[in-house]
Every structure is written in C-alpha cells, then in structure tokens.
Amino acid sequence: MSIGTAVRTVLAQYATFSGRARRSEYWWWSLAYSIVFAVLYVLAIALVGVEAFTNPEAAAPGAGGIGGLLVFGLIFVFVLGTFLPSLAVTIRRLHDTGRSGWWYLISLVPFGNIVLLVFAFGDSTPGSNAYGPNPKGEGGYSGQGYGAPQQYGTPQQYGTPQ
C-alpha cells in the first residue's frame, strides 16, 4: 500500500470504527498526517517570526500578526478535520491485532501511548478475528514479491556444455 492509497482509504472510511486496518495503512496515514502538520506548523512559526522581525509591535506577547494567526487557524481546522479519521484508523488497527478499540483509552494514562505504540507495531491476527477478515487475505499477504519463491522455466546448469 502506498502513502496515497493509505490516505485515500483512511479518508474514505472517515468515521468507520468497525473492521480492520493493516499496519501499512496505519503508518502511512500517520506519516502523511505528521508531514502536513509539521509543514503547517513551520509555516505558522515562520510567518509569526517574519512579522515580529518587520514589525516590533507584533513581537509583544499576545500581539501576533495576522499571517501567523491564519496559519494557526488552518492548523486547528486540519487537526479538527482529521481527528475522527485518525481515531478510526487507530481503532481499526487495534482490531487488526485482535484487541478492542477500548484499548485506545490507555493513551489517557501516563505512558499509555507507549503501550498503544507497541500494539500498533504488532502484526495482524492471522485469518479472521472477531472484527472481520484479515485485510492481508486469509493466508497472509499474497501480493507480488512476497511469499514462496516461484521458479520460472528450468534452472540453468552452469559449467556444463550445451
């Protein structure tokens, strides 16, 4: 699964808390989310810094310029708009490892995010589980490049004359 496919899948299942999400879907979504958030944040800090440098009154605490405020507003809209998909893909990822979505609440206690991170790195439950069929397929991932090696034609015999 590519990063674009993962983002489209997560956004298409905006508030779908049932089913399972593969590791790749979860981590590609997390990477895309982090990149967009970081770019917006750096842009906001840069705009606030430029305005504070060019306008000394804007450097006073609480007197941020309009550009930085607009970008911080955009960050707020981004975080608000992606909260449900992020929550949903995390719960589906927990389902894929055979755990209830209620395990997400462990992130509310100190160091609970570490436990959630370990769960997110975990492998899928083989076959179907209580939350649905394995998104990798019944026997694991069977895409090109994975699985048992395939032999095409007859092996070449090196060193023997033909």
Which residue ranges define each predicted feature?
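Selective recognition of hydrophobic, aromatic-rich stretches within alpha-helical transmembrane segments
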Residues: 1-5, 63-88, 97-122
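Short helix-capping/hinge motifs at transmembrane helix termini and TM-loop junctions
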Residues: 44, 48-52, 110-111, 121-124
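Membrane-interface extramembranous regions at the lipid-water interface
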Residues: 1-32, 88-102, 118-162
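Membrane-helix interface segments in multi-pass membrane proteins
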Residues: 37-83, 162
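Residue-level signal for alpha-helical context at structural boundaries
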Residues: 25, 44-45, 57, 112, ...
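Alpha-helical transmembrane segments of multipass membrane proteins
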Residues: 36-41, 111, 115
